[in-house]
Amino acid sequence: MRQAGRAALLAALLLLVQLCPGSSQRSPEAAGVQDPSLRWSPGARNQGGGARALLLLLAERFPRRAGPGRLGLGTAGERPRRDNPSLSIDLTFHLLRTLLELARTQSQRERAEQNRIIFDSVGK
């Protein structure tokens, strides 16, 4: 039973590594782990420390968010500046423009239909 649990854990870990982009790069947060028993090494898999290796790999894939003390910022409300605008803002404005265009087109169609009804009733 214990071997089956390890096999399932290993399969889940391999799937996680395949799904995460940049799997060959190590994060600086994970490289800064101070506890030598948690450091990953190629021989760590064979030492029975599978749980430790898994935790370290998860720490590499999903680093903790750096608090204000780690980045050296003065207040907790400050955020580091991003060079590139976020994709969500671009997507939001794109969707907003598209919806406005659709609403404008629908409004023009309704107005044209109302004008056609008026001209038909007047007899022009």
Swiss-Prot record:
It comes from the Eukaryota. The keyword Cell membrane does not apply. Pfam families: CRF. GO terms for molecular function: corticotropin-releasing hormone receptor 1 binding; corticotropin-releasing hormone receptor 2 binding; histone deacetylase inhibitor activity; neuropeptide hormone activity. It is found in: Secreted. Keywords: Amidation, Cleavage on pair of basic residues, Hearing, Hormone, Secreted, Signal. Residues 1-25 form the signal peptide. Residues 23-46 are annotated as: Disordered. Residues 26-82 form a propeptide. One of its GO terms (biological process) is negative regulation of feeding behavior. The modification Valine amide is found at V122. Changing V122A: Reduced affinity for CRHR2. GO terms for cellular component: axon terminus; dendrite; extracellular region; perikaryon; varicosity. Keratinocytes in epidermis and the outer and inner root sheaths of hair follicles, epithelium of sebaceous and sweat glands, erector pili muscle, cutaneous blood vessel walls, cutaneous nerves and dermal mononuclear cells. Detected in plasma cells in the lamia propria in colon mucosa (at protein level). Expressed in pituitary and adrenal glands. Detected in plasma cells in the lamia propria in colon mucosa. Acts in vitro to stimulate the secretion of adrenocorticotropic hormone (ACTH). Binds with high affinity to CRF receptor types 1, 2-alpha, and 2-beta. Plays a role in the establishment of normal hearing thresholds. Reduces food intake and regulates ghrelin levels in gastric body and plasma. Positive correlation between increased expression in colonic lamina propria and severity of inflammation in patients with ulcerative colitis. Belongs to the sauvagine/corticotropin-releasing factor/urotensin I family. This is Urocortin. It comes from Homo sapiens (Human). The lineage of its organism: Eukaryota, Metazoa, Chordata, Craniata, Vertebrata. The gene is UCN.
